[in-house]
Amino acid sequence: VHLTAEDRKEIAAILGKVNVDSLGGQCLARLIVVNPWSRRYFHDFGDLSSCDAICRNPKVLAHGAKVMRSIVEATKHLDNLREYYADLSVTHSLKFYVDPENFKLFSGIVIVCLALTLQTDFSCHKQLAFEKLMKGVSHALGHGY
């Protein structure tokens, strides 16, 4: 994925306007609610019985925050996302057996949550830049399969 200087600027602007931890929790909760089969990856997270339980689950929120912080850190490695995510890719593949399609699903949910959070400030240019980033992240995480 090729990110232009303008894309990088847009990504930084987006990340500067959101609470990354809150966004991450919201994104992971939505992933689990909208894609119920993904609950199998979080069986030790406690109560995942309803939308409300998932959205308030401290383990879901904490892990979502961790995921988004990883994406923020990845923005420091945009020219080599595959290397940055190499170990995590192998872990998700060999230890957790995560279907790499879930990375794409999560990416789409990040875009939805950004749009809900930023509303009119989430221009088509910002969306394009962040979609490029998330495509790169998804590809890098799926590379260890």
Curated annotation (Swiss-Prot):
It holds the Pfam family Globin. Residues 2-145 form the Globin domain. The keyword Transport applies. Red blood cells. One of its GO terms (molecular function) is metal ion binding. The keyword Methyltransferase does not apply. Gene3D superfamilies: Globins. One of its GO terms (biological process) is hydrogen peroxide catabolic process. Keywords: Heme, Iron, Metal-binding, Oxygen transport, Transport. InterPro entries: Globin (IPR000971), Globin-like_sf (IPR009050), Globin/Proto (IPR012292), Hemoglobin_b (IPR002337), Hemoglobin_oxygen_transport (IPR050056). Heme b binds at residues 63, 92. GO terms for cellular component: blood microparticle; haptoglobin-hemoglobin complex; hemoglobin complex. Transmembrane segments: none annotated. Minor hemoglobin is a tetramer of two alpha-2 chains and two beta-2 chains. Belongs to the globin family. Involved in oxygen transport from the lung to the various peripheral tissues. This is Hemoglobin subunit beta-2. It comes from Triturus cristatus. The gene is HBB2.
